[in-house]
Amino acid sequence: MKAQVLTLTGSVAHEIELPPVFSSEFRPDLIKKAVIAQQSRRYQPHGAYVYAGITASAVGWGSGRGVSHVPRLKNSSRAAKVPQAKGGREAHPPKVEKVLIRNINQKEKRKALNSAIAATISPELVRSRGHVFTGSLPYVLSGDFESLKKTKEVIAALRAVGVYGDVERAERSRKVRAGRGKLRGRRYKQRKSLLIVTGKERLRAARNLAGVDVCLVDNLNVELLAPGTHSARLTLWTEDAVRKLGGEQ
């Protein structure tokens, strides 16, 4: 399988042979399993205070009064301590000893990564994820792209190859998050757009574009290729990155 290598102006420079990994079987089940396993490494243990809800001075009345046998506050008939009482303990509070990490076999993880890479060259899968682009997949840019230093130069190159519309889609998607999260440092939600995979230089000029992630091919992982377990992210490869995927140095 071959792909066209594009210049910064969008013209075809030459063709390159794609590595066999781009022909891997599509396995959304393994991709989801691998992403969840990776996300679980960031979970933090949570636990309730041991004496929460049970510090009240309350005793049961015993039988013979025609009321339930729950602990009641002294000099009062108000129930306390039990889960169904106001201010009582929680029935099943979070435990710090709960195992949060989800593991995955190494072979499954490797196969999931290969499958996620292969999904990036399927126009049907990429469009079904909501991405906007013109032209054919995969997008492979010449090595000059990695040397860009200005964001406006990166934007011009993305416009030339026909993928900047997806960045604009991510810009329009920004909205205030519902719920308490907006008070906890995550006020806005925004869709993911382009993933740029480079071979040698991490393209810092693209880091402020809406929804764009940049990574070296050596650091590529399943979650970058399938955010939220949804595979087939619109991905832009540099020529050096493709050669490294094929085992070339």
From Swiss-Prot:
GO BP term, pick one: translation
Domain of life: Archaea
Gene3D superfamilies: 3.40.1370.10
PROSITE patterns attached to this UniProt entry: RIBOSOMAL_L1E
GO molecular function: rRNA binding; structural constituent of ribosome
Family matches, as InterPro entries: Ribosomal_uL4 (IPR002136), Ribosomal_uL4_dom_sf (IPR023574), Ribosomal_uL4_euk/arc_CS (IPR013000), Ribosomal_uL4_euk/arch (IPR045240), Ribosomall_uL4-arc (IPR019970)
SUPFAM superfamilies according to UniProt: Ribosomal protein L4 (SSF52166)
Complex and partners: Part of the 50S ribosomal subunit.
Protein's UniProt name: Large ribosomal subunit protein uL4
Lineage of the species this protein comes from: Archaea, Methanobacteriati, Methanobacteriota, Stenosarchaea group, Methanomicrobia
